[in-house]
UniProtKB/Swiss-Prot annotation:
It holds the Pfam family Peptidase_S9. GO terms for cellular component: extracellular region. It comes from Aspergillus clavatus (strain ATCC 1007 / CBS 513.65 / DSM 816 / NCTC 3887 / NRRL 1 / QM 1276 / 107). This is Probable dipeptidyl-peptidase 5. It is found in: Secreted.
Amino acid sequence: MGALTWLSVVAAAASTALAMTPEKMISAPRRSEVIPNPSGEIGVFSTSQYSFEKHKRSSWWSLLDLKTGQSKILTNDSSVSEILWLGTDDSTLLYVNGTNADVPGGVELWVTQVSSFTNGYKAASLPAAFSGFKTVTTKSGDIRFVAYAQSYANGTAYNEELVEKPLSSARIYDSIYVRHWDSYLTTTFNAVFSGTLKKGNNKKGYTLDGAVKNLVSPVRNAESPYPPFGGASDYDLSPNGKWVAFKSKAPELPKANFTTAYIYLVPHDGSEKAFAINGPDSPGTPKGIKGDANSPVFSPNSEKLAYLQMKDETYEADRRVLYVYSIGSKKTIPSVAGNWDRSPDSIKWTPDGKTLIVGSEDKGRSRLFAIPATARDDFKPKNFTDGGAVSAYYFLPDRSLLVTGTAIWTNWNVYTASPAKGVIKTLASANEIDPELKGLGPSDVSEIYFKGNWTDIHAWVVYPENFDKSKKYPLAFLIHGGPQGSWADSWSSRWNPKTFADQGYVVVAPNPTGSTGFGQKLTDEIQNNWGGAPYDDLVKCWEYVNKNLPFVDTEHGIAAGASYGGFMVNWIQGNDLGRRFKALVSHDGTFVADAKISTDELWFMQREFNGTFWDARDNYRRFDPSAPEHIRQFGTPQLVIHNDKDYRLAVAEGLSLFNVLQERGVPSRFLNFPDENHWVVNPENSLVWHQQVLGWINKYSGIEKSNPGAVSLDDTIVPVVNYN
């Protein structure tokens, strides 16, 4: 492995917790999943870290010893964007160089040795910004790969750096989408490409065999991966290198109105046009199953393809069901554990091809479950991981799994687990490595259940540093988005409960009606009920905390939320619960009911409110924070955040709310980021976001006076416009 020194990444936890400040949270190292080598001895992972001193991000790749938990740096070259192990060779790596000496905007593929990373050679030059590489090594020693890039309709890869800037900035559309998430649609789209690195004779290295092939463009209107969140999990390469499977939304349906997606199968060489195994004309399509399909994964023998699919064609939070397709079969594709009341989101086959390991939300966690590949629909899977949230998992030679995950108290946790033994050994955890996270641990978090509107409801409770149950701490009441989402035992760099708590709060983060991971009925009950049962659940949560948690000061509490959580904060402002908080924070939330028609994904609103804007208008207005009877109750100081590139909920929603608050004389502030979307991800912007959010709530909760180290609005580092 060379002369590099292995460093211990598992150290004794600090005896005293250190406050999680916004600066620490944002600048803490962010590590990727750990990918093991074929022998299971070491794993490779990437790290990136932002410096507020240098105002830039650095990145590097490391190796993790899977026996000792020690690590060493493999390369500090920030242009290396991906690294893959080649075949069954423990010593050879393929890496992607994000720069291209020959083609600006392209990438290069390099082959190198673990022991001498810098002595590799260039195997291929690719003409665009390809990413998401997957490889298999054939019996002849060739490397077959797939990756994706932007594409023109004619199948040519799109390279932004080689495109001449148009003379006009006009955009013209004859159909929707016009814009999606944070981008206006153009004539280019994502596509999966295939290629082969040919093994040379007489120890000659690998070279690209011809040009890469676009596997998606022959299917009119197809796109894979599907933006904005699609990636390498939207496609797969069979272990024998013969087949490629990819997901695409239904080409024949308006994409803004339907969630329907198909899984396509195509030869790796593109010799035949891709066909949908579960499309409307496919003989094996399960009856009545028309929703989103995703996560195609080939079996080890390349004879079967597992995937997930929802039933409803307009519902993004429908229950995903596991299906296993036999390559070439015309029989109806069978479901596996089809009655399971959970919604799996990832799949891995066991090496023997007999069992499927799936990840799924489950009671505020993201857990792993083992399911026989031929299981009947009444099979009830059992989890074999417990706390935290699983991010990725890979099989080791002993058939255990190398798992990478997070938790509320750590942004990186690496351990081994198996269906038979559960969690076996923790190899590394960021809270025991990084100074920024030192002292965080499972004791920072607990959970409660309380009687909600119609069923028991779950909530997380997160404690401040040096928590003393004999003292009182103001309540920070956090409301999640979605609405079909959840507060999970996972790390977030945007809404981090521990960062709120360490200002001096006890955070309560409930999972009310509409939340995911607690059974499909709880998720579905929010339909046409946005301000009904969920609001009642939140009221009952506040009442439970007030009565049963004596260390929580509800008299000086605050409430904050984003997206649907932002809507709920706006709804709370105009209802009785709003009077129980000293301050409110609404991030990118809806305010004016009639403005919902401006969103990008129309199927979402039409499903949520049981019809179109014109046919079901009363439903859209049923829970309208901007209704006069609610506006007249506004009185709690409120921070409003809304960003220009949020095309899910247009910035006019935030401006409308701020106008009303100002006109009503309610203490209020408007925070806007012109370059951010529904989220705030730029580190410098994130720091300002945290300064404003925490400074706002600290001012009105009294934390600013009681905790000298707390964030204050006096810390504001950008000019504040005030004409008064």
